[in-house]
Amino acid sequence: MQWRAFPLHPNTPEAGLLLEELFANQPVDIKKMMAHLGKTSADLGLPFGERKRTYNSRLAQELGLWAESRNAGDAFHMAAFKAYFVDGKNIAKIPVLLDLAASVNLSREEADAVLTGRAFKTAVDADWALSREAGITAVPTFVMNQDKLVGAKPYEALERLVVANGLKKRQAG
């Protein structure tokens, strides 16, 4: 599996937006949506906090690509997801991102230089362009060959995608 950056609400200001602000012009029942996400998370055994805001993930995506170049991509992404979805942290803030980098044993100083110098800006731009070209409009989206699986789906749906694209099912044990 390869992580790709995706422009999810890219115009969100650094301070974030209340979910009511984000969905102000859309027919979204935020309490119902959050209850559904909470139940789905619980059913999957995943922690999920009480989110009230959304934050701009652009810099987190840039740092995530850097973490991947340091063989710490999965650990960084998991730490960022926990910070955002469980702890409600503002992942647009550099101090938060530096803490996340340090939490997965990456150099805080190197991470600061990556963010300050925008060393992975072009790479994130390329991922965003790729998602537009592929017609991806939501996350998560899993793509194999020309097949897509969009949204939070049960494990079995992902398994069907993988098997349909020629990968053999692993045997337990």
PLM segments and residue spans:
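Structural alpha/beta surface segment adjacent to cysteine/selenocysteine redox centers
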Residues: 1-87
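C-terminal cap of thioredoxin/glutaredoxin-like
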Residues: 3, 65-173
